[in-house]
From Swiss-Prot:
InterPro entries with a match to the protein in the record: Peptidase_S1_PA, PLipase_C/P1_nuclease_dom_sf
Compositionally biased tracts (Basic and acidic residues): 470-481, 491-501
Organism the protein comes from: Bradyrhizobium tropiciagri
Family, similarity comment: Belongs to the peptidase S1 family.
GO BP terms in the entry: defense response to virus; proteolysis
Region described as Disordered: 470-503, 608-629
Keyword Chaperone: no
UniProt key word Secreted: no
GO MF term list: hydrolase activity, acting on ester bonds; serine-type peptidase activity
Coiled coil: none
EC number in record: 3.4.21.-
Its biological purpose: Probably a dedicated protease for substrate gasdermin bGSDM; cleaves the bGSDM precursor, releasing the pore-forming moiety, which integrates into the membrane and triggers cell death. Involved in defense against bacteriophages. Expression of gasdermin bGSDM and this neighboring protease is toxic in E.coli on solid medium.
Keywords (A to Z) from UniProt: Antiviral defense, Hydrolase, Protease, Serine protease
Protein name per its UniProtKB record: Probable serine protease Ga0098714_109514
Length: 785
């Protein structure tokens, strides 16, 4: 090449230049039967191509590879230049075109597109044959769902003409008057169609579809400064008008609190976005990760018009989007790393809501299918719908809604264990028992549990997340112990093991709880069965037939202290047999029950309100007043919503309660019956500190429900005492662990065996229904020693 020959500096090409070239050659590219799509991006270099050692070798390598370039065998490098990406069904070398070749020369994709003013735009040909997508008829959750708050990543369900359609709630937006969940239009239906979602307890009705929806817009209307004469920006975005905004958080489940909008427009949109990491949470796939592979992907042409998606996103291995993820928001990971060798954990990453996933493109290469996500700019969506992103709705709620109490009590208890070997063993396996306290206190929390499904679940939540489930069906779990399904969730023998309504008045004692503490003969299965029969007779005499049936129902007769007794016996046996996996599994699950015992509402007939009196509440959907029991809804508001919302303030108070010397400061016990009595003692203490009726009164006085004002009011009234009862729960749990360890002669187990355990070995134990089996009160006696 001489100084007089034309030389093109492709690195100076702008997004505008690339779009102008594609627009100019619109019909030319459209005529290529082999071309299935185009986009703009950076030139892809085959991964085994030698890196350039001299100037110019990047564009013209001395030993250039000629085999098919695909999305998986090529990459963007720091010297990649701007280009138009042309995706073709099949690959053919240049010699296959022409008189002696197999193909018409007119069908060859040009290497360069030349504009009238002398600019030249390179074309990068990529083999990426389109394939049909996988679909699923009904929604199936990817893992454990939130117990309480809905938010980004929650499923959106609509039923139209006998068919069910699912999508994902991407984020919350507001028009200044109402708040909406943004999702895919196809899961909204016509205006005012009722929309549903799912929590752990089952399906919930959340609102109605809005008439404000998007389908497609002319490219020139969305991007007036960019060329695109015969193109549509494809959109599939709808809004769900929420019945009760306080049921929602602006955060995405399992991700850090939502950051500021990743605002994209003609003036700042550049190819620097290529290869940038993004992540989101789909209702079907759970946590997904990817990278932005191309911009303005033309995926279809009809009647001479192109249909274009703003972003083509390549999935990370094993983390692709699927049917039901439409509506999900992709978050741009804009984190600045302080130490590249130790990247910041997910809760501390800087994520910016960037794009709404509305569709997918499946490419097939050598029989392997890869699902790419097509997404549109969230800033454009907000502009076209005339709404703004909501970032401050229940910001403190993110990650593990409903788990905070159980996990934190287990984490606090480990430090209180006196036996050095046992404490070290539990500390080494804290990730199996629970999470460390700093992680639990993070507003974003880590992603692990939210992605679990039928994989490993930290033990402190196994009784809720595994055993209180069916072992089959849509919301089933392997290892589930429930036996029947109903309109409000499933039921089975595990459920009554979590509580004991023993503050009913009986005999000379004010409560049956007091009678158990005063006389050990009341700590028998027969005495408890007689108590429930007495309560049933009393309810019937008062005209409360529902109450009478409840007290006689074997699945409603709470037996929490006997469940702790059963676990003490099991842990002792595991220690005696030197079965460290069995002991660890039982110890972690037992943390859940001692956590339940430390919550006053788990030991009271007022567990979710006082049925003997009613209050008038305004129904958010019907707009009408209704009569409900006094305190109805208090259980989840106090134990789930308030504790999760106030975790950052609660944990320092608990640490202060536990700051003195002496560990758990409780005597070690040597029998299951003594441990059952200690559990009743704990329930009595926490009821004295935080009387159940006081919780109900605070809830009603604060306005009921789970609005921020209600949670703030309850925290002001109950916060200090909540810390005190949770600290007691941690003390009694540490005492339970150490008592079983010492009584079973844990000192005989070689220290070399007290190592890090494999979570899958632990899971293999708890999915067995015979592992510390879940039994009703009338059946558990045979298990107790």
């Amino acid at each position: 090449m001489t100084v007089l020959d034309l030389s093109y500096n492709f690195a100076n090409l702008s997004v505008h230049d690339l779009l102008e070239a594609r627009d100019t050659y619109h019909y030319h590219l459209l005529s290529k039967a082999n071309v299935v799509g185009t986009a703009i991006g950076l030139y892809l270099i085959r991964k085994d191509e030698a890196w350039p050692t001299r100037k110019g070798e990047g564009k013209t390598p001395p030993n250039k590879k000629t085999y098919a370039r695909t999305l998986s065998n090529s990459e963007v490098r720091d010297y990649s230049w701007p280009c138009i990406l042309a995706f073709v069904r099949s690959w053919a070398n240049e010699d296959a075109f022409g008189p002696a070749g197999r193909y018409d020369p007119a069908q060859i994709v040009p290497k360069t597109l030349y504009l009238a003013d002398g600019r030249a735009v390179p074309v990068c040909v990529v083999q990426a044959d389109q394939a049909g997508s996988d679909t699923s008829a009904t929604y199936s959750p990817p893992g454990i769902l939130p117990a309480h708050k809905l938010g980004g990543g929650s499923p959106i369900i609509v039923r139209v003409q006998g068919a069910e359609y699912s999508a994902t709630a991407g984020c919350l937006v507001s028009d200044g008057h109402l708040t909406y969940a943004l999702t895919a239009r196809h899961a909204c239906g016509e205006a005012d169609t009722r929309i549903f979602s799912y929590l752990r307890s089952g399906e919930v009705e959340i609102g109605a579809s809005s008439a404000n929806q998007l389908t497609r817009k002319p490219f020139s209307e969305v991007y007036p400064d960019f060329p695109g004469r015969r193109s549509y920006v494809a959109l599939d975005v709808g809004l769900v008008r929420l019945d009760q905004v306080d049921d929602w958080t602006s955060n995405t489940y399992g991700l850090p609190p939502v950051g500021p909008l990743g605002d994209v427009h003609e003036k700042n949109l550049s190819l620097r976005l290529i290869d940038q990491p993004v992540l989101g949470r789909g209702a079907t796939s759970g946590l997904v990760r990817g990278t932005i592979k191309a911009l303005f992907y033309r995926y279809r042409s009809v009647g001479g018009y192109d249909y274009v998606g703003d972003f083509l996103i390549s999935p990370a291995e094993g983390l692709a989007t699927r049917h039901g993820d439409s509506g999900m928001v992709w978050h741009l990971d804009a984190t600045t790393e302080d130490d590249a060798a130790n990247p910041k954990p997910l809760p501390k990453r800087d994520l910016r809501p960037l794009a709404v996933a509305w569709g997918g493109q499946v490419f097939e290469e050598s029989g392997v299918r890869s699902a790419f996500s097509i997404a549109t700019s969230l800033s454009n969506v907000c502009k076209l719908l005339d709404v703004e992103l909501v970032t401050d709705q229940s910001r403190g709620v993110s990650g593990y809604w409903g788990r905070t109490g159980h996990y934190s009590i287990a984490a606090f208890a480990v430090a209180l264990v006196g036996d050095t070997d046992l404490r070290d063993f539990l500390n080494r396996n804290l990730g199996i028992l629970s999470f460390d306290l700093d992680t639990i206190a993070e507003k974003g929390f880590d992603k692990s549990v939210g992605q679990l499904g039928d994989n490993f679940v930290p033990l402190a939540d196994v009784p809720d997340e595994i055993w209180k489930k069916l072992d089959h069906g849509k919301n089933g779990r392997e290892g589930g112990r429930d036996v029947s399904a109903g309109p409000h969730g499933s039921d089975g023998p595990e459920h009554p093991n979590h509580y004991a309504d023993i503050d009913g008045e009986i005999g000379p004692h004010k409560t049956f709880r007091a009678a158990c503490l005063a006389d050990d003969s009341n700590l028998t299965v027969d005495a408890w069965l007689q108590y429930y029969e007495t309560m049933a007779a009393k309810a019937k005499a008062d005209g409360d037939e529902d109450g009478a049936r409840r007290h006689r129902n074997k699945l409603k007769q709470g037996l929490l202290p006997f469940r702790v007794w059963q676990f003490f016996d099991a842990m002792v046996a595991f220690v005696e047999n030197k079965d460290v996996v069995g002991f660890l599994t039982a110890a972690g699950a037992a943390a859940h029950y001692m956590g339940d015992a430390s919550q006053p509402l788990h030991g009271s007939v007022y567990s979710d309100g006082d049925a003997s009196r009613t209050v008038t509440r305004h129904h958010p959907r019907t707009g009408e007043d209704e009569e409900v029991s006094y305190g109805s809804g208090v259980h989840s508001a106090f134990e789930t919503a308030m504790i999760a919302d106030k975790a950052a303030q609660l944990f320092p108070l608990i640490k202060q309660e536990l700051s003195g010397p002496g560990g758990h400061a409780l005597p070690l016990l040597t029998s299951g019956k003594a441990m059952a009595k200690a559990t009743v003692e704990l329930m009595d203490k926490v009821a004295g500190i935080l009387e159940p009726m006081r919780i109900l009164d605070s809830y009603e006085q604060a306005g009921a429900g789970t609005r921020k004002a209600t949670l703030d009011g309850m925290w002001k009234d109950l916060g200090d005492d909540t810390a005190q009862v949770m600290a007691l729960g941690a003390r009694y749990l540490a005492m339970l662990w150490e008592s079983a360890w010492v009584h079973g002669k844990g000192s005989d187990i070689p220290v070399r065996n007290l190592t890090d355990q494999n979570p899958q070995d632990v899971r293999a134990r708890y999915i067995q229904t015979s592992f510390v089996p879940s039994l009703t009160l009338d059946k558990i006696g045979d298990e107790l020693t």
